[in-house]
Amino acid sequence: MRILRHIFALAAFLLPFIASAQFYVTGDDPGRLKWYSIETDNFKVIYPEGTDSLARVYAEKIERFRIPVSLTTGYLSGQGDGRKMPVVMHAYNAANGSVAWAPKRMDLFTLPSAYDPEPMPWSTMLSVHESRHVTQMQFGLTERQKPGKWFLGEGWNIVTF
């Protein structure tokens, strides 16, 4: 019994070192930031203070490319659940983006890379690319897939994607 107690104490001590937080990749924004939002017809863009003009650019681009991107997959972003897609802008990180479905959101890392020049503006490339991932994940919200969502929630999209 004493050995079991020591093993439990050691495991409780080591667990924080091996555990990963939910927002590990995107949680490195400075804690002092104040966050604001802009709502479009289909998206809610959440952005840090001081980047409102950049947020308007991204909001306009993801809204503008919503239908052209959906023509290649057959699904519109926001189709199926009727909620606006949260788009979280991270203006102080690297150049990248990601789409997660549990919780549902699109993360945009808006700082363009100085070492990887693109033929199109970074805001356009990022908006189109991440919008494509959103429409691909809409497949899990179709009528045929709803029973799976009853059991696994938003995690069902991960299984079907």
Language-model segments: which ranges?
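Absolute protein N-terminus
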Residues: 1, 21-22
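Bacterial N-terminal signal peptides that target proteins for export
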Residues: 1-11
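N-terminal signal peptide c-region/cleavage motif recognized by signal peptidases
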Residues: 16-18
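Juxtacatalytic substrate-recognition/specificity segment
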Residues: 23-161
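Short, flexible, solvent-exposed loop/turn segments with mixed acidic/basic and small polar residues
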Residues: 4, 14, 75-76
